[in-house]
Amino acid sequence: MNNYETVFILTPVLSDAQMKEAVEKFTNLLKAQGAEIVNEENWGLRKLAYPIDKKTTGFYQLVEFKADPSVIATLELNFRRDERVIRFLTFRQDKYAAEYAAKRRNLKSSKETVKENN
């Protein structure tokens, strides 16, 4: 199983419930295919670098997971078929990128615990 990271952008016209439902659809698809979700981050509504389909903002979502290479084709096919997804990018992490992502997650979680204690 390889480490993968995917970032996808959802259309900005979605409500919070619709956005969460779309994210849940893709994470459940990964789990059904035997992938292990390592990390999920909602980056929120952000400005796009350039307009896509006359939209200038979008909801960014990051998902890190471990899966077999065959899962990626299924995931990307579902991204292409879903009208809510504006763009997506999936790439395989090498061992250095996986280590960096783990350190970043640990640093982020330690900052959150410090904020909770204050």
UniProtKB/Swiss-Prot annotation:
Signal peptide: none annotated. Gene3D superfamilies: 3.30.70.60. InterPro entries: Ribosomal_bS6, Ribosomal_bS6_sf, Ribosomal_S6_plastid/chlpt, Transl_elong_EF1B/ribsomal_bS6. GO terms for molecular function: small ribosomal subunit rRNA binding; structural constituent of ribosome. The keyword Ribosomal protein applies. One of its GO terms (biological process) is translation. It holds the Pfam family Ribosomal_S6. CDD domains: bS6 (cd00473). GO terms for cellular component: cytoplasm; ribonucleoprotein complex; ribosome. Belongs to the bacterial ribosomal protein bS6 family. This is Small ribosomal subunit protein bS6. The gene is rpsF.
